[in-house]
Amino acid sequence: MPFSRLFGKKEKNQMDDIVEEGVQRVQELPMDKIFPNQFQPRTVFDQDKIDELARTIRIHGVIQPIVVREMEPDYYEIIAGERRFRAVLSLEMEKIPAIIQNLDDEEVAAIALIENLQREELTPIEEAKAYRSLLDMQDVTQEALAQRVGKSQSAIANKMRLLKLPETVQEAVLIKQISERHARSLLALETEEQQVALLAEIAENHWNVKQTEARIQEILGVKKQVATKKTKPKRQAISRDVRIAMNTIKQSVTMVKDNGMDLDFTEEETDDFYQITIQIPKKK
């Protein structure tokens, strides 16, 4: 199956073609010969949902087969359907219906991402890491990837910006201790130490996003005020001394001119000093 086909549809479930092409190859595979998808973007599974699915499977069986690929003789990797696999595993069933497909790593990674995006089950961090993985595997731009997964380029860029945060903050998003908007606001802080410290404040005070943003403005505002206080007195002192010196020189030049001497007076300001040039002609 060409890789481009996995990204070529937006309205129809991209998994449909796999099922249609492999429907004649449904097999009952031993559970102990199947292992999870190495490219599975989801790292946190809702156990309550798996238990609910297991109860349904206990009554009705596995209605939709999982999709796998054969990695070595009689050993299979899940391409799609890991929740079903986990539910069946919890029921201690020995076999599960599966469709065997011959797909490469890039196709498997793409399918895993698409399946989870369609169900909106990924956390923002999982989604961001999945995008990064696909970009690393494929020679494509964010814009091309956005078109292929039905997202805007800015949406993908914003998700991937979350990966600039410290691992501690990313983990907090992953376990839903803070929201994506909380995490995004932390990007305004300059250092990881500030971000981690504010994460602790958010958790301790149970701040919402608005309160978090207000606290960030306090932090940034205090830093700016401290910088201003440190430099302002020095600038004022220098300005006063320079002004006195400049006025004294100008008064002297004016006095000389008033006495009938023709001279040129120029001044130039650089980053480090004022330069004054006085030219007095040798001949009148």
Curated annotation (Swiss-Prot):
Its main location: cytoplasm. One of its GO terms (cellular component) is chromosome. One of its GO terms (biological process) is division septum assembly. Keywords: Cell cycle, Cell division, Cytoplasm, DNA-binding, Septation. Residues 143-162 bind DNA. InterPro entries: Chromosome_partition/occlusion (IPR050336), HTH_ParB/Spo0J (IPR041468), Nucleoid_occlusion_protein (IPR023705), ParB/RepB/Spo0J (IPR004437), ParB/Sulfiredoxin_dom (IPR003115), ParB/Sulfiredoxin_sf (IPR036086). Signal peptide: none annotated. It is found in: Cytoplasm, Nucleoid. Pfam families: HTH_ParB (PF17762), ParBc (PF02195). GO terms for molecular function: DNA binding. PANTHER family: CHROMOSOME-PARTITIONING PROTEIN PARB-RELATED (PTHR33375), NUCLEOID OCCLUSION PROTEIN (PTHR33375:SF8). Effects nucleoid occlusion by binding relatively nonspecifically to DNA and preventing the assembly of the division machinery in the vicinity of the nucleoid, especially under conditions that disturb the cell cycle. It helps to coordinate cell division and chromosome segregation by preventing the formation of the Z ring through the nucleoid, which would cause chromosome breakage. Belongs to the ParB family. NCBIfam families: nucleoid_noc, parB_part. This is Nucleoid occlusion protein. The gene is noc.
